[in-house]
Amino acid sequence: MGRRKKMVERVTTLMNEPEKIRNIGIVAHIDHGKTTLSDNLLAGAGMISKELAGRQLFMDSDEEEQERGITIDASNVSMVHTYNNEDYLINLIDTPGHVDFGGDVTRAMRAVDGAVVVVDAVEGTMPQTETVLRQALREHVRPVLFVNKVDRLINELQVDSQEMQVRLGKVIDHVNKLIKNMNPEKFKAGWKVDAAAGTVAFGSALYNWAISVPMMQKTGISFTNVYDYCKAEDMKALAEKCPLHATVLDMVIRFLPNPLEAQKGRVPTIWHGDANSEIGKSMASANADGDLAFMVTDISIDPHAGEVATGRLFSGSFSRGMEVYISGTARKSRVQQVGIFMGPERLEVEKIPAGNIAAVTGLKDAIVGSTVTTLDGMTPFESIRHVSEPVVTVAVEAKHTKDLPKLVEVLRQVAKEDPTLQITLDEETGEHLMAGMGELHLEVIAHRIQRDKNVEITTSKPIVVYRETIKKKIEPVEGKSPNRHNRFYIYVEPLDTAIVEMIKSGDISMNLPELERRQKLIELGMGKEEAKGIVGIHNSNIFIDITKGIQYLNETMELILDGFEEVMRAGPLTREPVANMKCVLVDAKLHEDAIHRGPAQVIPAARQAIQAGMLMAEDCLLEPYQKVFVQVPQLTMGGATKELQGRRGIILNMTTEGDLAIIEARVPVAEMFGFAGEIRSATEGRAMWSTEFGGFDIVPTSIQTEVVGQIRERKGLKRDLPKASDYLSM
């Protein structure tokens, strides 16, 4: 215990010296060695025993993580490293590499300033490497590179010293190419990784050694020596001469920014308030004496302390008992405890100043993405934008009726802990629906509900999440209120792809100042009148009012938008969410007496005009796709391509590297169930594969009627397709 206590003392001292702090994340493709690297860094810092490092998976503290051998949540830990005889505080977040848990990576990137990108020397950069690098650059998080599993190049692939250096050079070039393509400005500003400069390290996380150019200069060890040690399988000696933690953490301290340097550049990216205001200046300078500005990036449940909100403190200081505002809520909250994480343990401290990652209890109203502040009316931080969308749903029921109230509360909690999970109640069937990033994501959540929350549940077979959209523009449709006194004339048309992308990325939203939003839309080709008339955005759909001088319309607009949002949540074809559509109100006739234009009159009138309009505009289904990357020996390539094409997959690219074939395909999620078993048998168990979200596309006409019929039947609707007249005659 003495060692741990001493560590806490060192951590709490360094917390107050921002230039000595590094907030970093470790990111990579699944199985490239992030968690093993994290454990060895902790061992080097004296947090866990060196014998267990790489095998203990301290960061994978959850049973499910150890069992499946993957990281599911992002884990936090604070530790101390000595560089040039000075102590530094490193707040480290280990993130998942599996595509189903990408939401954790996105949120972790908001909390950190730098990232160690881990790439397997044998596999090279993979789809998730690209995804996590893109997320880091988007959040203004600076990368350095660690090329892992160098020993495998030498001992398994039997490459010589020269070939090893060529292969490592290729990995570096590929990472730089990605950075350059994703963000040319940052690349020009020196954000590339460069072995000669020292921003790249090579090694083996499993065998606890790493080398970099500065480390070579310090120890006299060359690439040839590294090759000889690996060939002789004497990696223990190599680990003594070039310990992994020293090489990697030296690189982190030397090349990744401290909060004072980082926040100057990061704050304008993640906060769009007035940079010259007191709070703007305070965040840019990580001022511990300014108003509090804290961004929640994770919510976890502690059995004793309740909800723990973890996040990045950009300004001010947290201490017990202080009162704070939480964005989106009216009342104040009182902070109960403040602390830091040491892996699974949360340690209480008296005070945490700006520039640190803090864990706080007492913020019951906070959700992931909340802004916590002492300043009433502060502009909140930009919302966290996730790269993928939920594509698979299961229905969840309590096994025993007595557990139903508990299940409702538990689902509320898991949705808070994991914002990439969508929980909805199907009003018609009474089922709770849980939508997630993939089968594995939902399996893990279901298992945790039973294990951690003690609620026995049954789940349905996974169902694909579809979207509805339209194919063409139509003339305005009249929607009448039930009392016939109010009429709305609305037309619908597909929304331009460039605008859809800007809405999805958060660059266009109702939170933007109106003039700024209007300007962006005009630049994207929208007419001035329409850009000025936007009154509502729901998911990737917009509602525009271009009417002129209609009496009582202002006080009715909220109800019209309620009708619009109802249809956007459940379209007329299959009651699935609507995407990529523009609704335009061109005229309205309203009763002068408010009693005759209440919710029961206005909402159905607006709703029916949009529903009928969508059916006239060729309402159709969009289905989610996954990009699938398969690595197989060339001999079994035929089996792999046949398997992908048999699932309505389109082969996008095929390359060869040595005797390996790399296939890139795009396959509908509906066809991916059971893929793991089938691809193994098609390739004699020799395929390695991974997936990433591949967007939505229109369901082929040949199967559309069948798919629509199945969805309608499942939801208890008539199998026959609805007609526009079904809505207009109501």
From Swiss-Prot:
The record's Pfam families line, in alphabetical order, gives: EFG_C (PF00679), EFG_III (PF14492), EFG_IV (PF03764), GTP_EFTU (PF00009), GTP_EFTU_D2 (PF03144)
Provide the protein's localization. Cytoplasm
Q: Name one GO molecular function term.
A: GTP binding
Got any disulfides in this one, which pairs? none
The source's domain of life comes to: Archaea
Residues recorded with modification Diphthamide: 596
Start and end residues of each tr-type G domain: 19-260
Q: Which UniProt keywords apply?
A: Cytoplasm, Elongation factor, GTP-binding, Nucleotide-binding, Protein biosynthesis
Keyword match Nucleotide-binding:
yes
- Does the record carry Nucleotide-binding as a key word? yes
Q: Name one GO cellular component term.
A: ribonucleoprotein complex
Q: Which residues bind GTP?
A: 28-35, 94-98, 148-151
**Could you tell me what this protein does?**
Catalyzes the GTP-dependent ribosomal translocation step during translation elongation. During this step, the ribosome changes from the pre-translocational (PRE) to the post-translocational (POST) state as the newly formed A-site-bound peptidyl-tRNA and P-site-bound deacylated tRNA move to the P and E sites, respectively. Catalyzes the coordinated movement of the two tRNA molecules, the mRNA and conformational changes in the ribosome.
Q: Which PANTHER family match?
A: ELONGATION FACTOR-LIKE GTPASE 1, TRANSLATION ELONGATION FACTOR-RELATED
The molecule here is called: Elongation factor 2
